[in-house]
Amino acid sequence: MKKTPLYEAHLRLGARMVDFAGYLLPLQYTSIVEEHLAVRRAVGVFDVSHMGEFLVRGKEALAFLQWATANDAGKLKVGRAQYSMLPNERGGVVDDIYLYRLGEEEYLMVVNAANIAKDLAHLQALAKGFRVELEDASERTALLALQGPKAASLLQGLTDLDLSQKRKNDVFPARVAGRPARLARTGYTGEDGFELFLAPEDAEPVFLALVEAGAKPAGLGARDSLRLEAGFPLYGHELTEETNPLCTPWAWVVKKEKAFLGKEAMLAQACRERLVGLVLEGGIPREGYRVLSGGRPVGRVTSGGYSPLLQRGIALAYVEEGAEGPFQVEVRGRAVPAALSPLPFVPLK
């Protein structure tokens, strides 16, 4: 089991540790709901050092990324970032990623922890036709996520850089609590916030400085409930190697006007199901629970849980393309009425 550079700090803060993608990470410190609401109302800090980081460099870095990713990497100026996906040749999704342009011929790709080895092998195979260098920087990169409406004001107290000039999806160098960092105004919670890329030896002092300044430490439990309220996908749940992204709410990522791996296969597939948001009248939905309509199964929950803001059980679910409802979710043998909800479940900041 791997440990992040913050492992000892988590234990000192009383974290309940769990195995996630081969890493020992905090599930929670106090309560998931308390940590969730701290991020929605003030500011929380997450250790996301388990995420993977790849550096892509070279004269053909952009050409390679245009082929390897579904979004238009050509629109990225230096110092900007975008959400994207790695398609496979069948039109499915190898992983969903964040891509940052660091220089004219240098990019940073952040990938999901469980997919680091798979993504690296996939990209290395694709890179053989391009003059490009691919480096796995995951082990020498620590990553913190400072999220919430008070994230900017808290972080401003620890850096000399004027953060008010930084927009969503900006990426830039800075010093935080006296340590060198790369900051990005990105996140996975639906709130304003920053992600801090650090050398492993700088992670603990910066993390503790953020906590001392008022950021509430938050674990994987709150990270998942926050992204669920925000209607964001989790790889392996809403997105898989078999998922056609054109049949999801994230079809906007796919730029059909450019060439990319698997484009023809993706465009040729008819959508047999669609992803919907559901708010239950009672009970807590979980992954794999059946969605019913007219007494018959028409879909399945891919992610479910309790929404601290709505104070209801909420779910992301795939249902048959023609299914219109009314829907129920089968919770422990009981068909619980579930109302269709637009996504996100809560307003994004």
UniProtKB/Swiss-Prot annotation:
It holds the Pfam family GCV_T. This is Aminomethyltransferase. The glycine cleavage system catalyzes the degradation of glycine. GO terms for cellular component: cytosol; glycine cleavage complex. The gene is gcvT. The keyword Transferase applies. Its EC number is 2.1.2.10. GO terms for biological process: glycine decarboxylation via glycine cleavage system. Gene3D superfamilies: Probable tRNA modification gtpase trme, domain 1. InterPro entries: GCS_T, GCS_T_bac, GCST_C, GCV_T_N, GcvT/YgfZ/DmdA, GcvT/YgfZ_C, TrmE/GcvT_dom1.
